[in-house]
A protein has these predicted regions:
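Acidic, polar low-complexity linker/tail segments
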Residues: 1-13, 22-25
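Extracytoplasmic/secreted cell-surface and envelope-processing proteins
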Residues: 23, 105-109
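Von Willebrand factor
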Residues: 47, 52-105, 118-128, 140-145
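Short, structured coil segments at secondary-structure junctions
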Residues: 110-112, 134
């Protein structure tokens, strides 16, 4: 049987912001969002890219595999480190989903769909100064009671 090229695999990349500005409560919201992605969306693979101002760790999951929550790292936020990693790996993801507090600058728009999953209290100022409002779908995560 011929092997499949990475670009043929239906995959999603989740850029998980693990910078110092992301608190424990927001990490819990991210965890809930990741759980929904794993349960509801039929990707062959999901890559979780933990990033701050650089990629800290990449974990690859196959469909149905349970995921582990990330460690916390410290530092600033550079969204472009995730898109750079995607390009370096030669991936053509079905989508890129950022889970972030929005404190950083959005990279140039890539050739694949992008969603920005943000804290429920994210304000317009953060969206505009980061450039997140320029492309992609903005999703405010719901607080879990």
């Amino acid at each position: 049987m011929p092997s499949r090229d990475k670009s043929d695999v239906r995959c999603a990349v989740v850029g998980l912001d693990t910078s110092g500005s992301v608190g424990n409560d927001l990490m819990e919201l991210f965890k809930g969002g990741l759980t929904r992605i794993f349960e509801d969306v039929g990707f062959d693979k999901i890559y979780i890219v933990d990033f701050t101002d650089q990629v800290q760790r990449v974990t690859e999951y196959d469909r149905g595999e349970e995921f582990n929550m990330s460690d916390r790292f410290w530092g600033g936020t550079h969204f472009g480190s995730v898109t750079d990693w995607i390009e370096e790996e030669g991936l053509n993801p079905s989508c890129l989903i950022y889970m972030t507090d929005g404190y950083g600058r959005a990279p140039m728009q890539p050739d694949y769909p992008v969603a920005w999953c943000l804290a429920p209290d994210t304000d317009e100022y953060t969206l505009k100064t980061s450039g997140i409002d320029q492309y992609g779908e903005v999703i405010l995560l719901k607080e879990v009671a």
